[in-house]
């Protein structure tokens, strides 16, 4: 039976630009994926339900074997399923707490292969006027969907180098996105200044 997969994924192998401007495959290639898996809505029935989609999605990850994955829109039940079905990956997500509601925490997760990476640091910020505190995007007409970026700093056990990976969830309204891109870039530059030798990946 064919399943309709309600997610959008981009998988790429990173390349390095060597001194003469030639693009070459890195000595230790890094395969990264960004994927909006769509939340498990009760309105999604049959082949569009998460129960029908989750195994094909996991199979795709197993087939492509990305080293790092940025995910948007997973909910609690989906987190639990992916943790159970993908035990070879470690993960970072923002959990609700006394200061951050479930809605404000949005929904995002970064996964990385346990055997290849160690997580040295992690963080998050909202794509809005107060990035350190829960906020909606600038001039948002949608008052329900918070948008944010989460990130991890990983140590690559193969190359010995550090890698920053950012997973960004942009708003629906295209008019809000330029400000979000600008905010994303500024925050990333501030974080990246901590080290000049790290690779930096934004999804």
Language model segments and positions:
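N-terminal, active-site-proximal structural segment of metallo-dependent hydrolase catalytic domains
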Residues: 15, 22-85, 99-105, 198-199
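His/acidic metal-ligating clusters that form di-metal
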Residues: 146-168, 179-203
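Positively charged n-region of N-terminal signal peptides that target proteins for export
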Residues: 1-4
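Acidic/histidine-rich helix-loop elements
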Residues: 34-55, 99-100, 128-144, 171-193
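Bacterial N-terminal signal peptides
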Residues: 7-19
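Structured beta-strand-rich core segments of catalytic domains in phosphoester-bond hydrolases
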Residues: 72-172
């Amino acid at each position: 039976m064919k399943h309709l997969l309600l997610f959008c994924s981009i998988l790429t192998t990173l390349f390095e630009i060597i001194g003469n401007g030639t693009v070459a495959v890195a000595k230790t290639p890094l395969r990264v994926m960004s994927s909006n898996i769509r939340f498990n809505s009760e309105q999604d029935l049959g082949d569009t339900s998460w129960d029908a989609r989750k195994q094909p999605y996991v199979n795709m990850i197993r087939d492509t074997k990305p080293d790092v994955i940025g995910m948007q829109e997973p909910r609690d039940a989906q987190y639990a399923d992916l943790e159970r079905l993908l035990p070879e990956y470690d993960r970072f997500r923002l959990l609700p707490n006394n200061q951050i509601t479930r809605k404000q925490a949005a929904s995002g997760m970064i996964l990385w292969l346990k055997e290849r990476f160690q997580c040295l640091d992690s963080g998050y910020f909202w794509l809005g006027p107060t990035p350190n505190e829960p906020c909606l995007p600038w001039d948002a007409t949608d008052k329900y969907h918070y948008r944010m970026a989460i990130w991890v700093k990983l140590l690559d056990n193969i190359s010995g180098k550090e890698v920053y990976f950012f997973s960004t969830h942009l708003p629906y309204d295209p008019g809000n996105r330029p400000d979000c891109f600008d905010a994303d870039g500024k925050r990333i530059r501030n974080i990246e200044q901590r080290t000049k030798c790290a690779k930096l990946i934004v999804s």
